[in-house]
Amino acid sequence: MKLMQIGVIGAGECDEETYRIAYRVGELIAEKGHVLINGGLGGVMEASAKGAKSKGGLVVAILPRKKDLCNDFADIRIATDMGHARNVIIVHSSDALISVGGGYGTISEIAIALKEGKRVASLKPPVVIEGMRVFETPEEAVNYCISSSVK
C-alpha cells in the first residue's frame, strides 16, 4: 500500500456534529496509515487533527499565517503567511481531499482540487459541485479517497 496524503478541509468554526464527523475522519486516516493534511486552525481542522493524533497518526498543518496560530495537534507546522492563498498548497500537497461542512474557503479548495483532477469526498457539503462525491459516513468518504490512485 502506498502512503497517501489526505487533505481534510472545512471551516475554522463548526457545530458539535461536524466536529465529531471530522474527528472520525481523522481517526480513520490514521488507522489506515496515511498522513492527514489540513489548515492547522480550529473547527474541522482541529477535530480531524485531534482524531488522527488519537490513533497515532501524522498531521501536517499548512497555516495561513505564523506557526503560533496552529492548534495543538499538528506534528509538522508550515507557516505560509499567505492567508487563504495557502488553500492552493493544501490541495496540491494532498492526493485526495475530504471536505466536512465548510464555507467559502472550503468551496475554493474543492474547486481547485477538482480542477486538478483530484478525488474529493464530501460530508455535509456547503455546495455540491460536479465531480465531487457526497457521502453519508466518514468510513465511506475515507475509503473513496484511499481507493484513488496517488497523483
UniProtKB/Swiss-Prot annotation:
Pfam families: LDcluster4 (PF18306). It comes from the Archaea. GO terms for cellular component: cytosol. This is Uncharacterized protein AF_1126.
